[in-house]
A protein has these predicted regions:
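Intrinsically disordered, low-complexity acidic/polar segments
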Residues: 15-17, 63-65, 101-102
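Short acidic amphipathic segments
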Residues: 33-39
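Short, surface-exposed ligand-recognition loops at beta-strand->loop->(often short) alpha-helix junctions
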Residues: 9-22
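Non-catalytic surface loops within mature trypsin-like serine protease
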Residues: 12, 60, 96-99
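An amphipathic, aromatic/His-enriched active-site/gating alpha helix that lines ligand/cofactor pockets
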Residues: 24-27, 32-33, 57-93
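Short, well-ordered beta-strand segments in beta-rich or mixed alpha/beta enzyme
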Residues: 2-8, 40-70
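Glycine-rich beta-strand-turn "strand-cap" elements at beta-sheet edges
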Residues: 2, 40-50, 76-102
Length: 102
């Protein structure tokens, strides 16, 4: 299994809206990709901005490429997500999942 890790930041006042967008629109839409296994959304708030870490789980790098394209290290954004984000990591990082106890 492959874990795709990416980070983005919102202004503090946009954090709840972005979280709602992730949970109700973006992530449910990924369920249609065969080999997509789910995601974790992590959030850390401070006074000025909120950091989001999104970890998507896929069966293989081939499935990641179906989602992200051949240059799969580039971050993928829906136009609506850009309305919330004030800064982003341009690249996603991929890890091989070696153990899971969840």
């Amino acid at each position: 299994m492959i874990a795709r890790h990416w980070r983005g930041w919102t202004k503090a006042e946009d954090a709840d809206g972005y979280e709602e967008f992730l949970k109700t629109k973006l992530l449910p839409g990924l369920k249609g990709i065969e080999g997509y296994r789910g995601a974790y959304v992590l959030r850390k708030d401070d006074l000025v901005e909120s950091e989001f870490v999104v970890v998507n789980l896929f069966d293989s790098l081939e499935v990641v490429k179906q989602f992200a394209g051949t240059d799969y290290s580039l971050a993928v954004f829906e136009p609506e997500a850009k309305e919330f984000l004030c800064r982003i990591e341009r690249f996603a990082t991929h890890y091989e999942v070696r153990a899971c106890t969840v």
